[in-house]
């Protein structure tokens, strides 16, 4: 009896200590974390292609840029799809995540929006301009403001407001969580907003932005997985589906008019 109890205890212990990130190579269930727009819509186009191959797809939506990488790294997700490459690189470096991108899908140009002015030239001296507060999008927003001729910034990747070298209009930079930026438009002169959050707020980047990032932006949004899973069949199938002709057609016809372009 003691021997039986000992074997049961050992079996339970082995089950308990299976790493959260372990994911069977023949697992037919794909759990993908996304932010709502346009990532969820894109995955919904890819899902039927995966279902034809015998996979089931569960989409989990997040409203921030932090939790999806935590959930992927700890094994709660099979993959995530919400971030661009520089943001991923920064997260891997600083949080020591064991994750990597496997496919580029689309580009969401960053735009400058305003309810107070209709053009960059109308932005007054002393204007308050809100930007994302995460390091990569913060630097990206400053480059958009520089491209618009409002400021000049030092060379480098992760620049901050402290790196502004010329600010002729004495613009005040306000740093906020990216998801909050559309709600700041009533209180700021302008805000630099990620396309996904702009569209969720009812804005149309191609029409409503008073300045927008170039379409050759290096900030492609990517499919991200744990490094240990890169060669697994389900991951390769997911990457193939997100780079399929069906997804490209959807982006070209439904999303490009809103400012989103394919990256494959």
Feature names for model-found ranges:
Residues 26-37, 55-61, 128-129:
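Short, well-ordered beta-strand elements
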Residues 29-46, 63-67, 84:
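Extracytoplasmic "Venus flytrap"
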Residues 59-70, 157-183:
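Short helix-initiation/N-cap motifs at beta->coil->alpha
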Residues 73-83, 127, 150, 169-172, ...:
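Alpha-to-beta junction loops
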Residues 90-102, 117, 187, 192, ...:
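Ligand-binding "clamshell"
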Residues 102-151, 248:
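A conserved helix-loop-strand patch within extracytoplasmic ligand-binding domains
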Residues 109-120, 220-232:
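A bilobed periplasmic-binding-protein/Venus flytrap-type ligand-binding module shared by bacterial periplasmic
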Residues 137-146, 242-262:
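Periplasmic-binding protein-like
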């Amino acid at each position: 009896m003691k021997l039986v109890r000992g074997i049961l205890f050992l079996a339970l212990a082995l089950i308990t200590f299976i790493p959260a990130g372990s994911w069977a190579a023949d697992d037919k269930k794909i759990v993908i974390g996304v932010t709502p727009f346009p990532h969820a819509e894109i995955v919904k186009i890819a899902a039927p292609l995966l279902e034809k191959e015998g996979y089931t797809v569960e989409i989990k939506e997040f409203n921030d840029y932090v939790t999806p990488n935590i959930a992927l790294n700890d094994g709660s997700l099979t993959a995530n799809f919400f971030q661009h490459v520089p943001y991923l690189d920064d997260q891997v470096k600083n949080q020591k995540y064991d994750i990597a991108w496997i496919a580029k899908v689309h580009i969401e140009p960053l735009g400058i929006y305003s309810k107070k002015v209709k053009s960059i030239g109308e932005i007054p001296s002393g204007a308050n301009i809100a930007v994302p507060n995460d390091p990569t999008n913060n630097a990206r927003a400053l480059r958009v403001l520089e491209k618009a001729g409002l400021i000049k910034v030092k060379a480098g990747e992760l620049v901050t407001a402290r790196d502004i070298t010329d600010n002729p209009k004495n613009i005040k930079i306000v740093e906020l969580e990216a998801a909050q930026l559309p709600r700041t438009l009533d209180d700021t002169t302008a805000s630099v907003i990620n396309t996904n959050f702009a569209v969720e707020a009812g804005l149309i980047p191609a029409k409503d932005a008073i300045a927008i990032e170039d379409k050759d932006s290096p900030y492609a949004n990517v499919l991200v997985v744990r490094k240990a899973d890169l060669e697994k069949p389900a991951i390769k199938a997911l990457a193939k589906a997100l780079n399929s002709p069906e997804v490209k057609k959807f982006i070209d016809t439904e999303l490009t008019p809103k400012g989103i372009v394919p990256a494959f």
